[in-house]
């Protein structure tokens, strides 16, 4: 019988050994979801393949929702670290579009894993899954950097939040094959220009 998701946050690793153990769990979980999809990932098998006790896995990740939300947060942080500076001559809204397009292509390399992470993040509650806040803040910081905004106002944050919600919908439609790559790019580009281009209500 599968373990019922617990309404508590996972423990944070406090030593290099614990951090390595946590990363091993995340890598095994990512490979498993990429191969079988979220529903068929078994926590017992993840623990066994990662070489940890099942109690250790549940200490860090009380449920699959915690596990794959953490994985998405790590992936966004890793992606942000690899994004180059905006090329000269690129408009801010085009730079944000390129960043979102690159994130989309990166996630679609392993569509079953992308679906697992999105489903988990959508099911997570912010009060018990702290990594949800890491996803939100990581994505906002990434797009603010691409946009070239150093001192964000509430209006900046609101526009980016709307754009991120739209991006999730476009990504889900790509995963469901409801949009072609060309349609997805066109929708994202239009959204970036409508929401981010300079105008009388900018700032």
Model-derived features with residue positions:
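Short hydrophobic clusters on alpha-helical segments that form packing/core surfaces
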Residues: 25-33, 75, 103, 167
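Hydrophobic alpha-helical connector segments
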Residues: 70, 84-109
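Amphipathic alpha-helical packing segments from all-alpha helical-bundle domains
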Residues: 124-168, 185-193
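Short hydrophobic/aromatic patch on the recognition helix
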Residues: 51-61
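Basic, helix-initiating cap at the start of DNA-binding domains
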Residues: 1-36, 40-49, 66-69
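C-terminal peripheral helix-coil segments that are non-catalytic and often amphipathic
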Residues: 1-8, 140-148, 176-203
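Short linear capping/connector segments at secondary-structure termini
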Residues: 84-85, 116-124
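Alpha-helical DNA-contacting segments of helix-turn-helix folds
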Residues: 33, 68-75, 117, 121
């Amino acid at each position: 019988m599968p373990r019922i998701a617990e309404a508590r946050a996972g423990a944070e690793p406090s030593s290099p050994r614990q951090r390595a153990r946590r990363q091993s769990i995340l890598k095994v979980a990512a490979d498993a979801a990429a191969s079988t999809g979220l529903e068929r990932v078994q926590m017992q098998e993840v623990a066994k393949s990662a070489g940890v006790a099942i109690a250790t896995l549940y200490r860090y990740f009380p449920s699959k929702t915690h596990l794959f939300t953490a994985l998405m947060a790590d992936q966004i942080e890793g992606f942000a670290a690899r994004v180059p500076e905006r090329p000269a001559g690129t408009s801010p809204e085009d730079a944000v579009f390129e960043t979102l397009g690159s994130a989309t292509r990166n996630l679609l390399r392993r569509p079953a894993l992308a679906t697992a992470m999105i489903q988990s993040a959508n099911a997570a509650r912010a009060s018990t899954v702290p990594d949800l806040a890491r996803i939100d803040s990581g994505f906002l910081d990434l797009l603010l950097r691409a946009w070239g905004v150093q001192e964000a106002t509430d209006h900046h944050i609101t526009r980016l939040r709307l754009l991120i919600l739209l991006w999730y919908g476009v990504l889900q439609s790509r995963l469901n094959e409801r949009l072609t790559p060309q349609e997805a790019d066109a929708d994202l580009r239009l959204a970036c220009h409508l929401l981010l281009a300079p105008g009388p209500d900018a700032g």
